[in-house]
Every structure is written in C-alpha cells, then in structure tokens.
C-alpha cells in the first residue's frame, strides 16, 4: 500500500486575523509541506491545477520541479492536470522534463477538471467537453508509448 498527500493549493484565510493568504506565501508553505512529506517517508505528493484566484497553483509541473530540487524520494504528481484545457504535447514535455529533474519521480494524473472556468481562458468549447478530453487523452497516451528521436533532423 502507498500513502500520499494531495492538495489543490488553495489559498487560506487565517481564522484569527481574517487575512487571506497570498499565492507566494501559499506556494512557499506548499514546498515546505512536500519536504516534510519526503522526510517522514510518504510515497507521493500531488498538486492540483486550478485557474482561479482562490488557488495558488495553475502550473503543477513548475511547483513540482521546485519540490524535486528539495526532496530525495517522494514521487511527485499532478492531481490533476486539466487535460481538457491543455496541450497534451506541452503536458508531456513538461512532465518528461520534471521526470529528468526529479530522477524518475514524476507522474501525471490527467483529468477533465471539476471547474469549467478554464475553458474560455484557453478557447475551448464547453459543449465539446467529452470529445476534447477523449482526443487529448488519446494523444497523451500515444506520446507516452512512442519513442521519438530528433537526432535525424539535426543538420
């Protein structure tokens, strides 16, 4: 059995002061949380992707790359990468790079997303929700299974 933690990186309100936590502060605390999770021996830490002002993380791969530099063993995953409003090639490349930085500890958890605010931001048609996700997931899986060497294209 594996044990891990995931977060959406939501910013919090201090119950004593009523002060809203800023994104910079939340991400700093998030990186500290990942370090502690690694030290105590948890197996995986996941960060969700959101494109709303009440969440601090819109690019999980970037935050996970910072965490990779500060940890040794814990696997690092998105929870989830909103594939419906993302370019699957870019997602694959970002996480392949994270996998290199982390020494093979990166994972992608792809999903549709539970909030639909990101669709108009990225020019997606909400009426094609299911078709968009299916097509992009198929491409992401093809990228994972296909070895590409660009060496033959170097002049």
Task: Locate the predicted segments by residue.
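N-terminal beta1-alpha1-beta2 module of alpha/beta enzyme domains
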Residues: 1-75
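Internal, glycine-rich beta/alpha segment that forms the wall or movable "lid"
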Residues: 16, 87-155
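Short, surface-exposed linear patches
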Residues: 24-29, 66-70, 85, 98-100, ...
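Glycine-rich "substrate-gating" loop/helix at the edge of Rossmann-like oxidoreductase active sites
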Residues: 53-56, 81-87, 125-126
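Structural detector of well-ordered beta-strand residues that form the stable sheet scaffold
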Residues: 4, 77, 107-109
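Outer membrane beta-barrel
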Residues: 73-80, 91-95
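Active-site oxyanion-binding pockets that recognize sulfate/phosphate
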Residues: 19-20, 27, 81, 123-126
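Active-site beta-loop-alpha junctions enriched in small/polar residues
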Residues: 8-10, 50-52, 81-83, 111-115
